[in-house]
Amino acid sequence: MLLFALLLAPARSFSQSQPVATDAAGTLIVRARALGLARSLAWRRLLHYRPNAKREPVSQVDGKGFFLAASGARDPDAELDATLRAFSAPLVPGNEDDHALCRFPARRELLDRALHFSGALHAPTCPALAQYLAELDPESVAVVYAANYLNNPASAFGHTFLRLQKQRPAVSNASDDELAYGVEYSANTDTDNPFWYAFKGLTGLFPGVFRFHSFEAKVHEYERGEARDLWQYDLALSRAEVRLLTLHLWELSATHLDYYYLTKNCSYHVLATLEAAAPRIDLVSHLNFVVLPRDTIKALYRVPGLVRTTTYRPSLRSRSLPQVVQREAPRKAPQSAHGSMRLTLGSGITTQYGSSFETIGYRLALHDLSDPPDGEMELLQVQFLDTQFRYDLGERSFTLNRLTFAELVALNPITRREAPLSWRGRAFGMRLHDRGCSDCFAHGLDLGFGATLASDDQHLALFVMADAYVAFSPSLDGIRGSFVRAGVGPYAGLRVRLPGNTLGLLTANWAYLPAQKLHGTYDVRATLRSALSPDVALGFEAALQPDSSELQFASYFYF
């Protein structure tokens, strides 16, 4: 609790005061310029400078108090000069915690390695910083991955955070978890409205902050409260790198970095912070423009020898599953998963116009029930911005065939101990082929709830749901002749994992259409997909609607 009080104290607010330069500061500035420290990778990473579109350095830290120069967010040279001036400024008795040497200990550590000025400057005691370091006193660092959690939109892709392992005191009966701290970067949210939440999260309108937690309490929350499996990756960092990371987290805990749900999120800033502490490692460059938590783990493995050991921590629910499921846990490690994005190329035939077609598709994220299963929760589907275009060779027309904005499916099998609800929800755009909408593109929302029966290893799953949807299209002959269609009815499916990393999925739904000329419609789909590697798959897809049937062969590339 002492640590949390320190990090929330008013004294942690940074100001932009500009101390007057002294002779000592001038000498240090001349030496720093001669050494080119402002251009060094270590300095730029410590202040989170990244090149913008014009290849100019811009810091990703958005709290103004983090910078001592007025132009510091865009000028590494000016910020370095201002830092050295601030380090040389006189102490104010009784207010040492506000001095730059106490506020920016990671900068002090980094610059002293090159300039060796510690003996020439005053040495403030920094009471708050000293208590912080005594409380943490870490000897090692790990990255922890928490599996997907669909009940919280911010965790639909999973979550990553840091574990700081405190050195064990000479006399202590505490467990390692009790001695550890968790450090995460997350958004400071101010709304429960899902639409406003999504808008602010996607556009960087939430400030993102670094928070410290009791690691034991965090594990309890994930493993018991949210039934989320954890994977812990212990890193091979030197003691000097661990210390610099600890000092840098002190600096970051007093500022904010704007939070972007798909890009500058928990995963991105965990890696950027590790790079700041250990400039020898290169992590952020291995990320796509959309950053998902499991991408963090894959990036760690791009640095040879960085991951020292891996520990799987199953949730309470996972520990209650049959042994055959628990034995497959190593295959579910996030570093084994396919790439988050997907490119699809296909060729097929359709009865709609009696011709063949070519398709190209792109999915922003993440996984469907037919994708390669390694590194994934067996019966979970999370998709965002799944787009498919089609060129009809007979009609010589290029059309948008599908646009799934978001689709979440959680098939939770009924067991002897519990009967959890299975559900799915999606915001979609797709082509309808029936008498109420012949080859028209409709947007809609779909929601279903039901039950799932599965084998012990979950390789065979049967699910049934009560489904309801609403669709909109100017071409629809909908409710009382309007452009709105509403439908309710059963939705069912069968998923089977076959030998050789092959998956089969069959889904079917029939919908009653109230107050409409067309009283009912149906949609049946079948997929057979075989993974050649974690990032390449081949497969067949078939679809049947009242006025159309089609079959296509497709190649899938994950990256």
Language model features with spans:
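Low-complexity, highly charged intrinsically disordered N-terminal segments
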Residues: 54-136
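Outer-membrane beta-barrel initiation region
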Residues: 129, 147, 263, 267, ...
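Glycine-rich catalytic cores of cysteine/serine-nucleophile enzymes that process amide/ester linkages
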Residues: 137-227, 362, 391-403, 415-420, ...
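Active-site nucleophile-His-acid catalytic modules used for acyl/amide transfer and hydrolysis
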Residues: 215-290, 460, 471-475, 541-542
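Transmembrane beta-barrel outer-membrane domains
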Residues: 336-338, 353-357, 394-400, 416-420, ...
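Outer-envelope beta-barrel architecture signal
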Residues: 337-343, 356-358, 376-385, 415-425, ...
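Transmembrane beta-strands of outer-membrane beta-barrel pores
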Residues: 347-353, 366-368, 386-395, 407-411, ...
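Outer-membrane beta-barrel "beta-signal"
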Residues: 362, 526-529, 547-559
